[in-house]
């Protein structure tokens, strides 16, 4: 593994109080933010320098799990996590719950030159993974303030980031087995089926308001597939009246939001509705809808990310009211993955009471992820006296804690400590090997961490939700 870290620069700090206010729920840690520059491959496979954000909890006595967070669609080059703009709040909040969270800007955004290959699975995956390697190197580098990471890894992302997190998840399990211990993956509202579900959703007879996505896909894939799409130009894909605006976006003269409103206004004027299909030349539209061998369709199919079998715990969060990414992406992905033999994949609906659109779905999905990840998270002390023992059992229900400690610990000095979510020691008591029950009285705590020590060494740590 060649070195990935080029440099890291401190940007800002947020206290736990500030983050709690931002999140609307109490968090455990303040967080330091760093802009990280690192080496990764561009769409042509050439190594270059990209940028991303590292969010580090402010406690160097704890070894934290890593989290790979992939951001959703942004407005353009500067609207990225490392600029504390698009997509930085969620990784910041996740970090405050005890994760060293990495959020790549992606290729063609932030410091990475060129056109961003939008929803290009390979570069989204490698940009996210190479940032993980860079931040792990940073934790071992004496030139930076000390922080410590475990091998445990959590993966997540929303919207474009759901597609990107799924791509990174697949890469990590298939190309980097053993590099990280993937505890859980949470893919939220992602377009996993680019070539089928998203094409039907965007190019059908119904209005589709984020029409700029289509232009960015075309620009990005022409960049990523120069051989496959060698005969394609913007002029051969889009109707002439849309070309100037798409080129202005390509040249970074306008952002995606401005491009979207310009195309939307023209479609409303010409057709009375935002029909995405109407920006495409007729022969291009017909070929996309009818010919699987059409080069653009081949490129789209190459970026479907659902036809595999994740072995780690995987949740796909969706809203049926989603107006930008059809919820059928999550249903299809969960079904195909399960048929492929994935042991633990489920699609979870977030808008059971009333429909939520793409923006409204963020909050319930992200809150669910905090609890989903939290149930799997292991926080370890940064000291080296850790020998976790899978034979030790700690179980909790209705204020009753049950310990199952192998008799091999009979001669050890055993101590059980309970910590609150914000790291306070709630109780400490001596315990004995074998089976034992303990009444805890934890009415005021929503979540606790139980840690068992043998002769001062941590041998088991387990997190429980108490209500």
What are these regions (language model features)?
Residues 118-142:
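Alpha/beta-hydrolase active-site loop
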Residues 188-307:
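Accessory cap/linker subdomain of secreted extracellular hydrolases
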Residues 378-409, 467:
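Residue-level detector of functionally pivotal "anchor" positions at catalytic/ligand-binding pockets or at interdomain
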Residues 387, 428, 443-467:
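C-terminal tail/sorting-segment detector
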Residues 1-62:
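Catalytic-loop region of hydrolases
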């Amino acid at each position: 593994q060649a070195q990935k870290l080029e440099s890291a620069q401190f940007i800002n700090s947020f206290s736990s109080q500030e983050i709690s206010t931002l999140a609307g729920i109490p968090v455990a840690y303040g967080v330091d933010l760093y802009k990280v520059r690192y080496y990764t491959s561009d769409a042509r496979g050439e190594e270059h320098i990209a940028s991303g954000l590292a969010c580090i909890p402010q406690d160097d006595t704890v070894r934290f799990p890593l989290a790979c967070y992939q951001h959703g669609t942004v407005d353009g080059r500067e609207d990225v996590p490392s600029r504390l703009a698009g997509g930085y709040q969620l990784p910041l909040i996740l970090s405050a719950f005890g994760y060293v969270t990495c959020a790549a800007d992606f290729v063609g955004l932030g410091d990475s030159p060129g056109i961003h290959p939008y929803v290009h699975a390979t570069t989204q995956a490698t940009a996210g993974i190479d940032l993980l390697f860079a931040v792990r190197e940073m934790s071992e580098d004496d030139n930076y303030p000390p922080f410590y990471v475990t091998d445990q890894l959590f993966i997540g992302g929303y919207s474009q980031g759901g597609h990107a997190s799924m791509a990174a998840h697949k890469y990590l399990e298939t190309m980097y087995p053993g590099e990280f211990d993937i505890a859980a993956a949470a893919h939220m509202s992602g377009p996993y089926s680019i070539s089928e579900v998203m094409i039907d959703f965007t190019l059908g007879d119904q209005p589709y308001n984020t029409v700029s996505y289509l232009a960015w896909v075309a620009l990005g894939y022409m960049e990523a597939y120069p051989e496959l799409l060698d005969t394609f130009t913007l002029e051969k894909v889009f109707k002439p009246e849309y070309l100037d605006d798409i080129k202005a976006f390509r040249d970074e003269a306008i952002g995606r939001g401005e491009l979207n409103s310009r195309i939307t206004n023209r479609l409303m004027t010409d057709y009375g509705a935002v029909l995405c299909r109407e920006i495409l030349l007729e022969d291009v539209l017909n070929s996309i809808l009818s010919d699987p061998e059409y080069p653009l369709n081949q490129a789209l199919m190459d970026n479907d990310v659902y036809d595999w079998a994740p072995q780690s715990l995987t949740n796909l969060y969706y809203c049926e009211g989603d107006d930008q990414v059809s919820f059928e992406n999550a249903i299809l992905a969960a079904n195909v993955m399960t048929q492929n033999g994935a042991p633990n994949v489920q699609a979870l609906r977030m808008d059971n009471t009333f429909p939520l659109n793409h923006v409204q779905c963020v909050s319930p999905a992200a809150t669910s992820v905090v609890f989903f990840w939290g149930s799997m998270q292991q926080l370890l002390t940064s000291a080296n006296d850790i020998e976790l023992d899978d034979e030790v059992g700690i179980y909790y229900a209705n204020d009753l804690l049950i310990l199952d400690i192998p008799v091999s610990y009979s001669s050890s000095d055993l101590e059980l400590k309970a910590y609150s979510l914000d790291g306070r020691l709630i109780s400490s008591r001596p315990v004995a090997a074998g089976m034992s029950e303990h009444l805890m009285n934890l009415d005021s705590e929503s979540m606790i961490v139980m840690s068992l020590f043998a002769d001062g060494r941590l041998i088991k740590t387990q997190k429980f939700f108490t209500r």
